[in-house]
A protein has these predicted regions:
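Non-heme di-metal
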Residues: 1-173
């Protein structure tokens, strides 16, 4: 990795961290009655989001949903099976039970994220995003049109790639 790539990675991490901190700061300001300050924090957080997006695009280049899902499965697996369990053990050894509980809870959530991404990756790999073996309800997120069937039928001249239709979630949440 060259210096510019290192800088793009560091900038992405910094902008991402700033976005989350500013979102947190906005909540604090709002709780304290500083609504205008909260709005400024939120606006700045949104700016930081776009800075980070430009940096990650430059760093990673073009990718596909399939590749992104595969990377997401790997990342969530690392977090759920290695990172957070290790952090929990370290917190326990240091006597910080609250942090240990938090890390263990997050590990479970990351496992759920991994499993969800894996289901979606399997759906993409098996070309089952817009078709099912059994009829399901498909709903247009723009006009509210609901259709029940095994294959999504597009309405209102909306292209498939526009994500106007969503299915009933294949997940239990």
């Amino acid at each position: 990795m060259n210096k510019t790539q290192d800088n793009l990675k560091a900038a992405f991490i910094g902008e991402s961290e700033a976005r989350n901190k500013y979102t947190f700061y906005a909540d604090v300001a709002r709780k304290e009655g500083y609504h205008y300050i909260a709005k400024i924090f939120e606006e700045t957080a949104e700016n930081e989001k776009y800075h980070a997006l430009e940096e990650i695009k430059m760093l990673l280049g073009e990718s596909s949903t399939r590749a992104n899902l595969k990377e997401a499965v790997g990342g969530e697996n690392y977090e759920s099976e290695d990172m957070y369990p290790r952090y929990a053990k370290e917190a326990e050894l240091e006597g910080n039970q609250a942090a240990a509980i938090l890390f263990n809870q997050i590990a479970k959530i990351e496992k759920h994220h991994r499993d969800r991404f894996q289901v979606l990756l399997d759906m993409v790999n098996n070309e089952m995003v817009y078709k099912r073996d059994e009829p399901i309800k498909w709903k247009c997120s723009v006009c509210g049109y609901v259709y029940k069937g095994t294959v999504l039928i597009f309405r209102m001249n909306k292209p498939k790639s526009s994500d106007y239709f969503k299915e009933q979630s294949p997940f239990s949440d």
